[in-house]
Amino acid sequence: MRDMLQLVPMVVEQSARGERSFDIYSRLLRERIIFLNGEVNDAMSGLVCAQLLFLEAENPNRPINLYINSYGGVVTSGLAMYDTMQFIKAPVHTLCMGTARSMGSFLLMAGERGHRAALPNASLHVHQPLGGFQGQASDILIHANEMQETKRRITRLYAQHCGRTEAEVERTLDRDHFMTAQQGVEWGLIDRVFAERDAT
């Protein structure tokens, strides 16, 4: 069963030179689609940041599409992706398919304003940063202060991207807060709900 979960489909393309095969993610990358599927961690962050930088180098004016299905994960890994999204010149359009929770929703709202979306049955979730520490009391206090600073930074960024006051964001993030896709639009996390693909 584990091998099936790690199976990556291959696609075959015909051209004048013959057949070429790609793993599905490489094929999507050619269409400027990055798929963030699973836990937000250092490995995922490295892959997503590298793909963002590669696509910007190819064409800094064409949008990049970041499709998200994630329960979240490590805050610093998510912030690395966030900073890269803001740093590159190419606009990043975000779309939630499935769920965007915790750092997943944070990355969803970090997309280009007007181009942040979710599919109709997507589940969105926001909360304050989580952490746990062990050790000497003085070290625990240092970590707690750092966690408070991270919480303030994330609150400011949600407020900036969602058009809310920091006080509103802090109240919402105080406990686990789930939203439907439509509620995500109303809160400012996303801009629209896609019922079907736009005609191109």
Swiss-Prot record:
This is ATP-dependent Clp protease proteolytic subunit 1. InterPro entries: ClpP (IPR001907), ClpP/crotonase-like_dom_sf (IPR029045), ClpP/TepA (IPR023562). The active site is at S102, H127. It is found in: Cytoplasm. Keywords: Cytoplasm, Hydrolase, Protease, Serine protease. It comes from Bradyrhizobium diazoefficiens (strain JCM 10833 / BCRC 13528 / IAM 13628 / NBRC 14792 / USDA 110). Cleaves peptides in various proteins in a process that requires ATP hydrolysis. Has a chymotrypsin-like activity. Plays a major role in the degradation of misfolded proteins. PANTHER family: ATP-DEPENDENT CLP PROTEASE PROTEOLYTIC SUBUNIT. Gene3D superfamilies: 2-enoyl-CoA Hydratase, Chain A, domain 1.
